[in-house]
């Protein structure tokens, strides 16, 4: 379901860049395949090429949510692309929400295409970070698009359909959304190394379903638990930064 027309123009537009504290931030927009997508291209001051991390936030996140992560990575010599998710991810209308989810993943595939047009982006050293809802999207992305060297799956689980079905109070919704559960796609990832990060005090991600996602990943992988809630903590962020720096060195 995550295929797309690679010939469709990206219509990339770059705004004015601003530099602060050795970090350059530039707004951008492009055709994500199902409408325009806005976000930020963040990179170290100076010349590249830089490895790149593609971010996907949680269900209530925006292109700004993971800018603190992008700033920390810039200090390590890594560029980042942070992007808005689609609007209204969960309406409790199963077919509409499935279309939105597919558009989210396709938009991230188009974002990987955009990297080839961004100045000083090293398209051979690319990783992705997904948090919560974005973790499911990132797991699917790794399974269907094999341009990722690695991916950090934060507060993810095997079956996104479970919390969504509970939220919508609908077994039918859960069955329908189960068609795109991340556990069905992460096993198809090729050449991708994974870091799974979860909090022991996270009520949304039970350990059994987290472990099921980790088991499904076939390549090199590492799983870390934290004494933290769904949002994780500073230690998890430090670990992710260091892991990405090693992976993309």
Language model features with spans:
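N-terminal cap/lid segment of alpha/beta-hydrolase-fold proteins
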Residues: 3-47
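Conserved alpha/beta-hydrolase "acid-adjacent" motif
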Residues: 203-209
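Short beta-strand element of the alpha/beta-hydrolase
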Residues: 49-58
């Amino acid at each position: 379901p995550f295929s797309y027309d690679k010939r469709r123009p990206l219509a990339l537009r770059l705004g004015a860049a601003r530099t602060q504290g050795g970090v350059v931030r530039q707004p951008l927009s492009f055709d994500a395949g199902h409408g325009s997508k806005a976000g930020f291209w963040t990179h170290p001051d100076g010349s590249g090429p830089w490895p790149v991390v593609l971010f996907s936030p949680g269900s209530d996140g925006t292109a700004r949510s993971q800018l603190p992560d992008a700033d920390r990575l810039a200090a390590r010599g890594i560029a980042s692309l942070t992007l808005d998710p689609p609007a209204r991810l969960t309406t409790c209308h199963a077919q509409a929400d499935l279309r939105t989810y597919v558009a989210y993943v396709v938009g991230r595939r188009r974002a990987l295409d955009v990297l080839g047009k961004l100045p000083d982006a090293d398209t051979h050293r690319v990783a992705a970070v997904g948090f919560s809802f974005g973790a499911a999207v990132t797991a699917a992305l790794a399974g269907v698009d094999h341009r990722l060297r690695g991916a950090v799956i934060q507060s993810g689980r095997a079956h996104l359909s479970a919390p969504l079905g509970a939220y919508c109070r609908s077994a039918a919704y859960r069955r329908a959304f189960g068609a795109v559960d991340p556990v069905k796609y992460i096993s198809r990832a090729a050449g991708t190394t994974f870091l799974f990060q979860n909090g022991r005090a996270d009520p949304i991600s039970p350990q059994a379903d987290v472990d099921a996602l980790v088991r499904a990943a076939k390549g090199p992988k590492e799983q870390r638990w934290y004494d933290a809630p769904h949002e994780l903590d500073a230690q998890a962020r430090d670990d992710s930064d260091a892991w990405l720096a090693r992976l993309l060195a």
